[in-house]
Amino acid sequence: QGDIPVIVDPKAECIQWFQPDVIVDAILAKRNLGTKITDAPFVIGVGPGFTAGEDCNCVVETKRGHTLGNVIWDGSAIPNTGVPGNVGGYSIERLIKASADGVIEPKAVIGDLVRKGQIVAITGGEPVYALMDGIVRGMLQPGVQVTKGLKIGDIDARAKQEHCRTISDKARAIGGGVLDAVCSYEKSRGKYALILLAAGQSVRFGSDKLKAVVEGEAMYESA
């Protein structure tokens, strides 16, 4: 019916009974939380923390820049710098971080326009202030337990509400890299051959070079 099934499975126990052909670890924790190259016939790690050939078959780059979305078949993605990419002239200011340990109580929701210095959330009873003007692009749900300094949301200086309901350029590039990797895997499983036809008059092989005998056999014979 075209519906996408979603399973809440923190320990990924469904891998044991579902036995998928492909696993994509897109947790984006900046480190491997337990994914193994033996979990499925083809395992993709997204972002830093994975090494192709060791804990996964390939890695997809997630850092903004020229290599965003690239499929890495040998080695790892660019290490996490802890500094978010520049969007609209802002970097670290884009992040909304918990001001204290405790439960989060959002004061702004995705799509809200906020001003620098505005309270956008309460964490552990302490206010969290926006560090820039813009639109809220991400925010954790109410009641989530957080720790001081944890990223709980982000702000976009471009301030376009439609961006909150569409796939971002970064997400599209990363998704494209995953798709490219899966397609490469599918091709490797099948039996493929490339035939380059170059029939025609030839000084060396005569009127039909595909039928010319080389080392006792015709270069090409139809089935």
Where are these regions (language model features)?
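N-terminal glycine-rich phosphate-binding loop and ensuing alpha1 helix
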Residues: 192-223
